[in-house]
């Protein structure tokens, strides 16, 4: 075996030369000729593997190392994966978008914008997959490229078509970040791994949940950015990352037959973040039929390679990387493993048959898969694409040397530099400028409409389309087609007749069908087609050995997007008759529909708005949305229909507050609230007309999504992507689903003072001072109504009240205090105070309010920024607000506090520690994991600096827990082994290292270090 460390395979920071940027993902092309890497620098780079594996090629000046740099993403690229056909490259980024890349055969090459790197190959974005609301962390292609699945930090799993890349299904079954995805090689399941401590297996037939696997992840940490799972090539084993066996980090093996997870790979010192099965099966060591080879990458910076049946790994690489492993990828031969790390380097592990045994043939692999009883009906179009010369699999590395100042024509005359497996060059396609003809028309409103038309230099239009997708027509061969049995015909017919997408669609060039072939068959009858096929078979039986081969020579050219099936081998004439009858009906309906669309389009140059009935269509044909059929009236000027009722400072009778304490909001003729790209609008009228409630799409010219009416005027509204809520004057709150169905009608104790929402949580504060909170998705109340009057003191003291992303309320007061509600203790908790801004040494006086985006990521910091802004204004006398505004009538300024000189030091230490403790508590309640860990470490450092032994011991005991604690036997214990996804004992280890630095705490720390070490052992 050998280990290769190509230092030139790297992503360099543009602003800091020589410094390497993190490489998040690595993927080897199915023909092993190319290596794609994805980096923190927002770029994808494609490298020639020949220069990596072959020292002679690496040292050859004529060999190209970097083939292309792809730079269309606007954020860090977190994952790259090649399609199994080899044609497409898919990438996912933290810009929330996944891109599908395709090699442009007519591309000019050159360099990326803003980069000096020269591209030998020209890769262009083929499709843009937009649908996630946060980082796209992982993606996977189905084995036959029928589907592609993307997962992200928005907790969603989105399944796309692998042929036309339309969105097929959104799976919203996880409750945490989804960080890994893999398809079953048999095509039956899709597995996803999430921070909600589950791996879920979904059926590809209906995308329903088959099994949720939880046992290996009950105590797994959430610190890992990836949880990349892998499926064995024979489909029998699912390998899951970031699993735990007690306190030990493991990779869990899940058996397909029973979904049991009692087998582990043990040995890594930190979480396993990526798993990868070799695509081959090998001769078994343990006397079994075969064995599999698997690689693991961990946060402990090491890579291990295992063979099933052996108790020990065959390779453990500990010193290859300086930082954690991010991704793994096997080449098609099953012996070469590529790994990347966050230190910005790539390593290649080339194994020998002596180390891991001999690989078995593809026939043996198919036999092993067949044992599961799953009939693998492959997507014909997707499977066939892999055999076409339109991708890169059949021409793995056709490279041309480029010279400065050399024209495209001159470069075309330079002989290509072939690499093993390349195909002969073909006549270059006309440049894009030659193929594009534009028709520009001016609409009635003065806008330009550009209608591009592809035309060829010496080709018919249909031929130009075919050449755009392929260098040359693929020869017809039934050997390239998957074997489809006779009993599968009804399913194929159903797919042909019942779908409007090209799941079975043929692209130009499929089965020898290209633009040069005659289209006369499409105008004939099905009987004529069959007769022609049979006659051709009788006249030339050698050339037409099967009905399929005969039919392929007579098939008309079918445009991309037309549903279309492929006849199986051995089909009878009756089956072919039925097939062509159904196909012809679909084909002629498509032509008729296009003619109708063209006729309708010629009537007017104006584009009809969405929601307006199309010509010749009725509401029964296309359905409708309430309020979308008629143009919406202009809102007109905003008027106050009812003045606000000012709140009282408090009416007290017999020690009990009574009456209205907070202001009743005014009733406006127009009330609109825009939140997270959504808008909800209220239009109030006099008593002669009902109130209109509408949800609008501001990105589409305020298109009405749904409309409702109310006999009572509305005062407040709020909306999220899950629901909308409206508060009425009669103390009623109406709740609507995202599509406009009314799912709630709640009568509160009094009218609403504030109505806020976030995610699935709705919060209402009434004028009587009671706060209500509901989880709309779970359809239940979070807690009983709680008073906010004791927080305010005076209604004017309220600065803001919002709902955090996890549903916790955040109340910020003008008196420089911030509170949230602890659902466990059912009480208000002070999480920030201007007192700390004045006296705590941990306070950051430079922070300022930066908006909602920061509050979601770092809520504690954002809250302190608001308090700090108030504090600075008060101290500097600029727009004085805050603590000087008291509810007392005399407005007496606060008395300055003084601390005796001999106690000032203890005073500062005490205030600082109380401040850090409040930060830790706030981060816990607001589910801010990163802030929790940062403040915990800062708290430990401060205790160590001051040498405070009693608080140090309290901190250690809270993290180490009971010495004899066993999760499986003590489920009801009050102590929990994790907090916010962190393992408490791991945190305890870090805290002990900090507390061990001062000598006066050594005697306290050492016994706990020994106890913790024994627990891990």
From Swiss-Prot:
GO biological process terms held by the UniProt record: chromatin remodeling; DNA-templated transcription; regulation of DNA-templated transcription
CDD domains listed in its UniProt record: WD40
Subcellular location: Nucleus
Annotated Basic and acidic residues bias: 618-638
Spans of repeat WD: 18-57, 72-111, 131-170, 173-212, 221-261, 267-316, 320-359
Function: Required for replication-independent chromatin assembly and for the periodic repression of histone gene transcription during the cell cycle.
Protein name, as recorded: Protein HIR1
């Amino acid at each position: 075996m050998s280990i290769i460390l190509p230092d030139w395979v790297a992503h360099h920071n543009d602003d800091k030369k020589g410094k390497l940027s993190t490489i998040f993902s690595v993927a080897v092309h199915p023909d092993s000729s190319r290596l794609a890497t994805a980096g923190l620098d927002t770029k994808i780079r494609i490298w020639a593997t020949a220069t990596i594996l072959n020292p002679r090629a690496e040292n050859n000046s004529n060999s190209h190392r970097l083939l292309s740099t792809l730079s269309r993403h606007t954020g860090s690229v977190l994952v790259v994966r090649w399609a199994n056909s080899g044609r497409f490259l898919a990438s996912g980024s933290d810009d929330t978008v996944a891109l599908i890349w395709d090699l442009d055969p007519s591309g000019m090459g050159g360099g990326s914008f803003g980069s000096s790197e020269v591209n030998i190959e020209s890769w262009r974005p083929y499709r843009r997959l937009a649908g996630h609301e946060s980082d796209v962390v992982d993606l996977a292609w189905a084995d036959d490229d029928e589907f592609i699945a993307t997962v992200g930090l928005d907790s969603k799993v989105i399944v796309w078509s692998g042929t036309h890349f339309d969105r097929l299904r959104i799976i919203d079954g996880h409750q945490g970040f989804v960080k890994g995805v893999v398809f079953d090689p048999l095509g039956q399941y899709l597995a996803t791994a999430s921070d909600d401590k589950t791996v879920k297996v979904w059926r590809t037939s209906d995308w329903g949940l088959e099994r949720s696997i939880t046992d290996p992840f009950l105590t797994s940490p959430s610190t890992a950015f990836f949880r990349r799972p892998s499926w064995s090539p024979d489909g029998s084993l699912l390998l899951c990352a970031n699993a735990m066996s007690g306190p030990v980090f493991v990779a869990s093996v899940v058996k397909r037959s029973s979904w049991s997870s009692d087998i582990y790979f043990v040995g890594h010192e930190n979480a396993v973040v990526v798993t990868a099965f070799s695509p081959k099966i090998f001769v078994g060591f343990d006397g079994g039929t075969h064995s599999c080879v698997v690689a693991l990458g961990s946060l402990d910076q090491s890579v291990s390679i295992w063979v099933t049946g052996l108790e020990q790994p065959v390779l453990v690489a500990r010193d290859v990387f300086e930082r954690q492993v991010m991704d793994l990828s096997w080449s098609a031969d099953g012996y070469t493993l590529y790994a990347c790390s966050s230190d910005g380097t790539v390593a290649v592990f080339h194994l020998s048959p002596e180390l891991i045994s001999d690989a078995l043939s593809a026939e043996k692999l198919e036999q092993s898969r067949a044992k599961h009883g799953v009939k693998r009906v492959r997507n014909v179009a997707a499977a066939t694409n892999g055999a076409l010369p339109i991708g890169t699999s059949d021409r793995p590395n056709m490279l041309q040397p480029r010279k400065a100042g050399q024209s495209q024509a001159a470069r075309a005359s330079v002989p290509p530099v072939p690499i093993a497996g390349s195909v002969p060059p073909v006549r270059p396609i006309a440049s894009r400028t030659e193929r594009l003809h534009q028709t520009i028309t001016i609409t009635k409103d003065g806008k330009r409409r550009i209608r591009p038309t592809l035309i060829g230099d010496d080709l018919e239009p249909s031929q130009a389309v075919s050449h755009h997708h392929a260098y040359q027509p693929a020869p017809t061969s039934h050997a390239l087609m998957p074997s489809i049995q006779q009993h599968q015909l009804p399913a194929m017919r159903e797919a042909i007749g019942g779908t409007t997408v090209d799941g079975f669609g043929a692209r130009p060039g499929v089965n020898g069908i290209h633009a040069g072939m005659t289209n006369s068959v499409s105008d004939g009858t099905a009987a004529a087609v069959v007769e022609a096929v049979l006659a051709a078979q009788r006249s030339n039986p050698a050339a037409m050995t099967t009905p399929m081969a005969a039919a392929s020579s007579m098939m008309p050219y079918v445009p991309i997007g037309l549903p279309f099936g492929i006849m199986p081998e051995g089909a009878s004439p009756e089956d072919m008759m039925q097939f062509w009858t159904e196909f012809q009906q679909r084909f002629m309906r498509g032509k008729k529909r296009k003619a109708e669309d063209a006729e309708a389009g010629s009537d007017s140059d104006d584009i009809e708005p969405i929601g307006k009935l199309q010509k010749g269509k009725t509401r029964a044909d296309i359905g409708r949305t309430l309020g979308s059929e008629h143009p919406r009236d202009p809102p007109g000027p905003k008027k106050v229909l009812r003045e606000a009722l000012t709140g009282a400072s408090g009416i007290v009778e017999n020690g009990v507050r009574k009456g209205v304490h907070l202001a009743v909001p005014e009733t406006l003729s127009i009330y609109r609230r825009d939140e997270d790209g959504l808008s909800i609008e209220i239009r109030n009228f006099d008593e002669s007309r009902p109130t209109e409630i509408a949800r609008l799409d501001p990105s589409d010219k305020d298109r009405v999504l749904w409309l409702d009416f109310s006999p009572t005027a509305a005062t407040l509204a709020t909306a999220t992507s899950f629901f909308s809520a409206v508060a009425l004057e009669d103390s009623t709150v109406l709740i609507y689903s995202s599509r406009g169905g009314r799912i709630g009608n709640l009568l509160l104790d009094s009218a609403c003072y504030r109505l806020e929402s976030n995610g699935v949580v709705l919060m209402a504060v009434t004028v009587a001072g009671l706060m209500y909170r509901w989880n709309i998705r779970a359809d239940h109340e979070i807690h009983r109504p709680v008073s906010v009057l004791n927080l305010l003191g005076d209604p004017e003291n309220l600065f803001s009240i919002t709902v955090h992303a996890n549903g916790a309320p955040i109340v910020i007061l003008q008196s420089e205090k911030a509170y949230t509600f602890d659902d466990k203790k059912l009480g208000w908790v002070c999480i920030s105070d201007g007192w700390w801004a004045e006296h705590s040494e941990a306070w950051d006086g430079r922070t300022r309010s930066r908006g909602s985006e920061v509050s979601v990521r770092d809520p504690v910091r954002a809250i302190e920024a608001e308090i700090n802004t108030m504090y600075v204004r008060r101290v500097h006398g600029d727009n004085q607000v805050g603590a000087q505004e008291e509810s007392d009538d005399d407005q007496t300024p606060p008395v300055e506090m003084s601390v005796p000189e001999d106690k000032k030091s203890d005073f500062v230490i005490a205030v600082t520690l109380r401040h850090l403790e409040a930060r830790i508590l706030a981060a816990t309640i607001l589910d801010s994991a990163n802030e929790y860990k940062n403040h915990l470490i800062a708290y430990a450092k401060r205790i160590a600096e001051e040498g405070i032994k009693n608080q140090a011991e309290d901190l250690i005991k809270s993290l180490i827990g009971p010495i004899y604690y066993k999760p499986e036997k003590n489920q009801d214990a009050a102590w929990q082994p994790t907090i916010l996804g962190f393992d408490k004992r791991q945190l305890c280890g870090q805290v002990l290292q900090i507390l061990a630095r001062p000598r006066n705490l050594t005697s306290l720390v050492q016994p706990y270090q020994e106890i913790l070490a024994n627990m891990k052992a």
